[in-house]
């Protein structure tokens, strides 16, 4: 049987980090087994579902590179199908109409709680076979088995057993004519041939209810894999403040999509002690059965380390468009400075994110207007005009502007003055960047461009008073 998985977000908000991990595991499992991955949008919550959220989910999936074979399929476009299946259950005596008011339902729950019983629907309409009538309280309830046990072998959690006596007759169609979650997902997964349902363990309590509906329909029951939640760095439930942010905020924070994929894959799954995986390695090695049953903790330092690894090892040309995105966010005209790929080469050993890289790179895209006063006092003092002047002379004479030629010119300047390279590099670094800290001096000067470098040296000479 062909493996078919699905990711089924509810568009009531953006795709957060937990949802992204679920999507990734569903995608990896399908790809690993040579199957198909389906995207379904569970948008039947009409009050909370928005097109903005749908667009954000699709954008995040695209950014992460999680392509799907079918979809997006929208539940709101399948209402007639849900009605058809509900009517089938009604005709077979496996579901029934109920018309209790909100006050009557509240009274049932209060009576149960007074007896120290689980608050639940008491089955008042179960055997009445009430006909359809136009009523604002009309619902359709599923006849849950009264006896027996629901047993399933979760691919992550192991064997789980729930007594049917713990379950009541849940609503499968609401008064507004829309199906409930537990009913719609069963019909969807049945129609779509889903063989493995991979989702968060907050859905475990829904699973026995859903299995009973599958069996009532005579539908094949898929395998289930319930992943533990992701905790924050203190071991508490994730919040927006502690990492449960929109996935695209990770893009804005300067993380590479494949670095986030690598990190999320390891957030609950492992292959020995290996930390870094190419996409092909993930596809070859991933098996949902190997997902840890214990909750994983978000570790932003680890994510930063993984991201820096890919900044250091990826082709700079592939990183360049993402650096340009960060620069534009800062209001930078990327055409007004060096090629982004060259900036990546210069800075990738010094930063963990593209956001940091862009912030450090601004100095090469805008006129230098501010200087670190301590750096000026230390390195642009009287006497610094000599190495700066010689460096300017050598740089101005270059026929071709390249890192290698800039390096040769600066070393020639130091040799001509019989100075150590540091005596040339430090005043030049302050002249070019306004600070004492920058990448290799040859790269620092090269990235300023010939005209920009000479102009900044001239400004520094004026500052020294020796123009």
UniProtKB/Swiss-Prot annotation:
Annotated ATP binding sites = 240
Show the GO cellular component annotation of the record.
Answer: cytosol
Please provide the Gene Ontology terms (biological process) for this protein.
glutamyl-tRNA aminoacylation
Keyword set for this entry?
Aminoacyl-tRNA synthetase, ATP-binding, Cytoplasm, Ligase, Nucleotide-binding, Protein biosynthesis
Q: Where does the motif 'KMSKS' region lie?
A: 237-241
Compartment annotation = Cytoplasm
Chief location of this protein?
cytoplasm
Q: What class of enzyme is it?
A: ligase
In chain numbering, motif 'HIGH' region lies across 9-19
Query: So what family is this one in?
Result: Belongs to the class-I aminoacyl-tRNA synthetase family. Glutamate--tRNA ligase type 1 subfamily.
- How would you summarize the oligomeric state and partners of this protein? Monomer.
Please report the name of this protein according to its UniProt entry: Glutamate--tRNA ligase
- The protein's organism comes out as Xanthomonas campestris pv. campestris (strain ATCC 33913 / DSM 3586 / NCPPB 528 / LMG 568 / P 25)
Gene that produces this protein: gltX
């Amino acid at each position: 049987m062909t493996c078919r998985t699905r990711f089924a977000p509810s568009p009531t908000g953006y795709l957060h980090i937990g949802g992204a991990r679920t999507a990734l595991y569903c995608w990896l499992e399908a790809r690993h087994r040579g199957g198909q991955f389906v995207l379904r949008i569970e948008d039947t919550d009409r009050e909370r579902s928005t097109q903005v959220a749908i667009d954000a989910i699709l954008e995040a999936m695209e950014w992460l590179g999680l392509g799907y074979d079918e979809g997006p399929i929208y539940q709101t476009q399948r209402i007639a199908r849900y009605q058809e299946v509900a009517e089938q259950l009604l005709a077979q005596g496996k579901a029934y109409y109920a018309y209790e008011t909100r006050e009557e339902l509240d009274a049932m729950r209060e009576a149960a709680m007074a007896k120290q019983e689980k608050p639940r629907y008491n089955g008042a309409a179960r055997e009445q076979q009430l006909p359809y009538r136009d009523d604002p309280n009309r619902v359709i309830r599923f006849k849950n088995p009264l006896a027996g046990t629901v047993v399933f072998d979760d691919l992550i959690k192991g064997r789980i057993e729930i007594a049917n006596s713990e379950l009541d007759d849940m609503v499968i169609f609401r008064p507004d004519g829309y199906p409930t979650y537990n009913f719609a997902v069963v019909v969807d997964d049945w129609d779509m041939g889903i063989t493995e349902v991979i989702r968060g363990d907050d859905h475990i309590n829904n699973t026995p209810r859903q299995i009973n509906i599958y069996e009532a329909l005579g539908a094949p029951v898929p395998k289930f894999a319930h992943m533990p939640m992701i905790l924050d760095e203190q071991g508490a439930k994730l919040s927006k403040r502690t990492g449960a942010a929109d996935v695209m905020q990770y893009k804005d924070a300067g993380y590479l999509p494949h670095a986030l994929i690598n990190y999320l894959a390891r957030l609950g799954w492992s292959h020995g002690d290996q930390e870094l995986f190419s996409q092909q390695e993930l596809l070859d090695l991933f098996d949902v059965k190997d997902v840890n049953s214990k909750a994983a903790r978000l570790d932003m330092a680890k994510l930063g380390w993984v991201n820096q690894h890919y900044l250091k090892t990826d082709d700079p040309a592939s990183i360049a468009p993402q650096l340009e995105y960060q620069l534009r966010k800062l209001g930078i005209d990327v055409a007004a400075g060096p090629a982004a790929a060259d900036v990546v080469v210069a800075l990738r050993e010094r930063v963990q994110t593209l956001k940091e890289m862009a912030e450090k790179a601004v100095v090469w895209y805008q006129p230098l207007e501010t200087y670190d006063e301590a750096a000026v006092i230390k390195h642009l003092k009287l006497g610094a005009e000599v190495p700066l002047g010689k460096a300017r002379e050598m740089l101005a004479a270059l026929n071709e502007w390249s890192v290698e030629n800039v390096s040769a010119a600066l070393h020639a300047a130091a040799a001509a003055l019989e100075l150590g390279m540091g005596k040339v590099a430090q005043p030049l670094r302050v002249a070019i960047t306004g600070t004492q800290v920058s990448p290799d001096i040859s790269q620092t000067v090269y990235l300023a461009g010939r005209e920009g470098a000479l102009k900044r040296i001239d400004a520094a000479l004026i500052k020294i008073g020796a123009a």
